[in-house]
């Protein structure tokens, strides 16, 4: 029997995803992702409010990892291999869809493509069940990146982490990332680092692993530590003229700040918030209060 192809490019039999333009591509892509997940046993929902999560997926799996990524166990209560009761796992999926563009370089010779996507600091939830899913109908690949795996990959490869998280565009601007590419041998790479373990069936294997639900608190703390290591570094980027001593001073300040006790950090944040309340012009306060992060975190200037 031929191995199941995932994702199924013909999940909608009467229409092709490439028939849609960029103006409605996002919604079509989310439907395409949802139907492919349903096809392998996930129950998929859409959040009532748009908080940066596009889909919520749930599935029953064996707590010891015996459930295959494409198994549908909606009618079973126990694992057929070990007899343990199944547990329900949850994934909060953020879908990123882009047109995959051909790299126009002499070296590529028309045989390499890059996937440009945008991620901002607010997208990085401190929850191991949060997942980035990158998809383009040009390659028909799902690149499935659970939060912990994504951060750990860039932490392990420090040069990638600095390029990704330390530049000003990560905190302001659109932070468009164009490092991920696919070569003529169907390998997804970022500056020589392979992303193949996150693609299609392999990515679904990672997504279906129950460890993030079973050890939720432990992996939440690990993500916090990774974010401290990756986010609290400063790099001026290519366009900003900042001296090396200034960069060193800023990074030393970050190091001191994140090593403080939680109470001291909370006190500094409270003082900073109070200064914003007193010093910001009223029109800017209004803009901040209506912004995404402040709105959903309940802060009011």
UniProtKB/Swiss-Prot annotation:
Q: How does it assemble?
A: Heterotetramer of two alpha and two beta subunits. The alpha subunit is believed to be responsible for DNA recognition, while the beta subunit is thought to mediate cleavage.
EC numbers: 3.1.21.4
**Cofactor(s) annotated in UniProt:** Zn(2+)
Source lineage? Bacteria, Bacillati, Bacillota, Bacilli, Bacillales
Temperature curve summary: Is one of the thermostable restriction enzymes that remain active after 20 to 30 cycles of thermal PCR cycling.
Q: Which keywords annotate this record?
A: Endonuclease, Hydrolase, Metal-binding, Nuclease, Restriction system, Zinc, Zinc-finger
Give the record's GO biological process terms.
DNA restriction-modification system
Q: How is the cofactor bound?
A: Binds 1 zinc ion per subunit.
Single Gene Ontology MF annotation: zinc ion binding
- Effect listed in the UniProt record for changing residue 82 to K: 10% of wild-type activity
Task: From the UniProt record, report the name of the gene that encodes this protein.
Answer: bslIRbeta
Q: What is this protein called?
A: Type II restriction enzyme BslI subunit beta
- Domain of life, per lineage: Bacteria
Q: Where are the zinc fingers (CHC2-type)?
A: 62-82
Q: What is the effect of changing residue 79 to K?
A: 10% of wild-type activity
Reaction catalysed?
Endonucleolytic cleavage of DNA to give specific double-stranded fragments with terminal 5'-phosphates
Applications (biotechnology): Could be used to screen carcinogenic mutations in a restriction endonuclease-mediated selective PCR (or REMS-PCR) assay. In particular, could be used to detect the vast majority of mutations that occur at codons 12 or 13 of the Ras oncogenes that encode glycine (codons GGN) at those positions.
């Amino acid at each position: 029997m031929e191995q199941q192809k995932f994702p199924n490019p013909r999940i909608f039999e009467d229409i092709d995803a490439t028939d849609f333009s960029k103006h409605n591509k996002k919604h079509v892509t989310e439907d395409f992702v949802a139907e492919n997940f349903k096809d392998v046993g996930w129950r998929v929902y859409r959040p009532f409010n748009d908080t940066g999560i596009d889909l919520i997926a749930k599935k029953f799996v064996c707590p010891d990892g015996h459930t295959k990524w494409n198994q549908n166990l909606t009618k079973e209560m126990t694992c057929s291999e070990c007899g343990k009761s199944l547990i329900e796992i949850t994934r909060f999926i953020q879908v990123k869809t882009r047109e995959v563009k051909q790299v126009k370089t002499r070296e590529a010779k028309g045989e390499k493509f890059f996937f440009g996507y945008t991620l901002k600091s607010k997208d990085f939830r401190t929850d191991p069940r949060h997942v980035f899913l990158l998809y383009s109908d040009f390659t028909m690949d799902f690149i499935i990146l659970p939060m912990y795996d994504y951060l750990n990959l860039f932490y392990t490869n420090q040069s990638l982490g600095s390029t990704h998280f330390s530049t000003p565009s990560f905190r302001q601007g659109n932070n468009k990332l164009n490092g991920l590419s696919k070569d003529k041998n169907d390998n997804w790479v970022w500056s020589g680092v392979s992303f193949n373990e996150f693609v299609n069936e392999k990515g679904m294997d990672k997504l279906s692993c129950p460890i993030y639900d079973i050890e939720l608190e432990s992996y939440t703390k690990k993500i916090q530590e990774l974010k401290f290591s990756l986010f609290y570094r400063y790099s001026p980027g290519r366009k900003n003229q900042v001296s090396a001593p200034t960069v060193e001073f800023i990074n030393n300040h970050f190091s001191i700040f994140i090593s403080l006790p939680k109470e001291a950090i909370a006190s500094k944040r409270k003082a900073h918030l109070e200064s914003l309340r007193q010093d910001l012009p009223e029109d800017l306060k209004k803009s901040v209060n209506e912004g995404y992060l402040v709105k959903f975190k309940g802060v009011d200037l």
